[in-house]
């Protein structure tokens, strides 16, 4: 066994200084990194770390195993062009490849990834593409980069999992697709960059999740039916959260005063309204709490840390960045649900956060 805190290394990932591709060879584009944990051999086996670089052009996903003593490469996926991908082993030998495709993971990534089991082993949803447990390309929709995506059983009346994603390039807007095949179940179009979108179960009158984004400014059910269309009453387009005692999602929003000022929202069937804490205050009123950015309202971490199935949210103290403020609900609930960390996709999602 290695000593606690001992540094471990494994070769195989593209060097930090590597740049590539016309306008995209500068640091902001080449140095985009994501990471996650995936049970690539199935839930009964050890998990792998998946380290990722690049999503505006070339995309690399590096799966690494740890046996308690050393790191070893499981595989390295490289989508080098829009039409070609290869998978290499730890010695750099090509073990799988495909050429002349209509789309790969090249330029398809998002600002986050998602991990979930769609066929018995975990796969990585990499924006508009998905990488199989063996490093091969599972599918690519070709709809390109986006700022947000959600992977879950969004439609309980369909078998398997679904993905909701928004896209930066016009006119792609958003898409709702099968997580295993990439089949587009419905989509919306837009004339601009659709920079925000959320899938959350905010309305108990409709089965499954509801979805909304900046492009259409409509709330739709999981079948694409519009259930609310007042642009001035759209819910926040950031994070969903379990906070009060019912079984619907609440939302994390950001206000302008002061900057990066987080607060909770609740959907009432027609519009989203602020949801104060039990003391009548909002998250930003306590401990000088601020989010990591404004338009996405990103907290330091959101997870069911304490285990009663409602979620905690952590923000940093604007007056003292060494302080973290942990918020938890004190609202009673009549529902007894196992801690969310027992859910496979949820636990992996906390890891990639």
What are the language-model segments listed below?
Residues 1-353:
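Extracytoplasmic/lumenal domain signature
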């Amino acid at each position: 066994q290695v000593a606690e805190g001992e540094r471990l290394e494994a070769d195989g990932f593209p060097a930090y200084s590597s740049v590539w591709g016309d306008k995209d060879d500068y640091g902001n584009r080449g140095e985009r990194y994501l990471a996650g944990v995936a049970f690539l051999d199935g839930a009964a086996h050890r998990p792998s770390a998946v380290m990722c670089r690049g999503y505006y052009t070339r995309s690399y996903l590096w799966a690494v195993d740890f046996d308690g003593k050393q790191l070893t490469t499981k595989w390295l996926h490289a989508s080098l062009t829009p039409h070609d991908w290869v998978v290499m082993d730890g010695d750099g030998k090509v073990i799988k490849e495909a050429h002349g495709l209509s789309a790969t993971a090249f330029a398809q990534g998002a600002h986050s990834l998602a991990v979930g089991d769609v066929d018995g082993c975990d796969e990585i949803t990499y924006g508009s593409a998905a990488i199989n447990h063996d490093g091969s390309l599972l599918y690519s929709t070709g709809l390109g980069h986006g700022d947000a995506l959600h992977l879950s059983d969004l439609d309980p009346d369909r078998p398997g999992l679904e993905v909701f994603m928004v896209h930066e390039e016009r006119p792609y807007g958003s898409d709702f697709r099968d997580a295993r095949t990439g089949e587009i179940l419905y989509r919306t179009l837009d004339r601009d960059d659709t920079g925000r979108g959320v899938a959350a179960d905010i309305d108990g009158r409709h089965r499954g999740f509801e979805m909304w984004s900046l492009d259409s400014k409509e709330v739709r059910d999981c079948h694409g039916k519009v259930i609310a269309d007042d642009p001035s009453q759209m819910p926040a387009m950031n994070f969903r959260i379990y906070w009060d005692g019912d079984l619907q999602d609440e939302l994390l929003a950001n206000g302008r005063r002061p900057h990066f000022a987080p607060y909770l929202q609740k959907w009432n069937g027609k519009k989203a309204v602020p949801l104060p804490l039990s003391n009548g205050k909002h998250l930003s009123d306590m401990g000088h709490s601020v989010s990591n950015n404004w338009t996405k309202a990103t907290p330091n971490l959101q997870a069911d840390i304490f285990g009663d199935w409602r979620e905690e949210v952590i923000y940093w103290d604007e007056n003292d960045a060494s302080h973290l403020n942990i918020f938890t609900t004190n609202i009673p609930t009549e529902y007894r649900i196992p801690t969310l960390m027992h859910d496979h996709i949820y636990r992996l999602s906390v890891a990639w956060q």
